[in-house]
Amino acid sequence: MTTTATPPQAIQVSVLRWAPPIVHGLVRDLRVRWALEEAGWPYRENVVSPADQASAKYRELQPFGQVPAMECDGLKLFESGAIVHHIAERSPALMPEEPAARSQVTAWMFGALNSIEPPVMMFNVLDMIYQGPKGEEYNGIRTWVAAWVESRLDVLAGVLEGQEYVLGRFTAADVLLATVLRILRDTDFVRKRAALAAYQQRCEARPAFQKALRDHLANFAAHAPKN
């Protein structure tokens, strides 16, 4: 597919009405917002409540009742990776023109979601969300998952040595990789790897990311529960 700079006419992104502060900056609508900002595509929010998520109408858009989902000129899409890929396929800001280079971007997008995010999410659940007993069995599992995370990040750090982004220039792969790394923000996994720390800072310093994050957080602030 040849990329085009012409944006669709009507884009709506479904986002959570509110979420606890522990996940602010992590909910996956941030990826979609960032990709849209990089592409220069204007969009409007469809703010959904828990009741909306459970409704038959919303399940037609997102079968699992999650966010994000996107409606784009009549097309309905769900899953953040699929949405970012759809945007990238149509935006030269996120995807190069040359076929082999495009394939490499796609490979790294899948790598972010299939090879790196699963152990990262598992560690996050164990370390920050799980509230059950934390005895010898828990510690053994946590140690094993931490080693899994370390091994994946060692590979990524090696790839990033000496270059700004995973494929040289910024692409949609970096949108997914950087948002996966954000999940580890309360750990030292990224901080202790200079190449990864610099990479994440570089990605998050981009104006498009900053705008996406501001809008993501502003939505939660606007709908925060009243005390």
Mark where each language-model region is.
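Short, solvent-exposed turn/loop segments enriched in Gly/Ser/Thr/Pro and often Arg
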Residues: 49, 172, 216-217
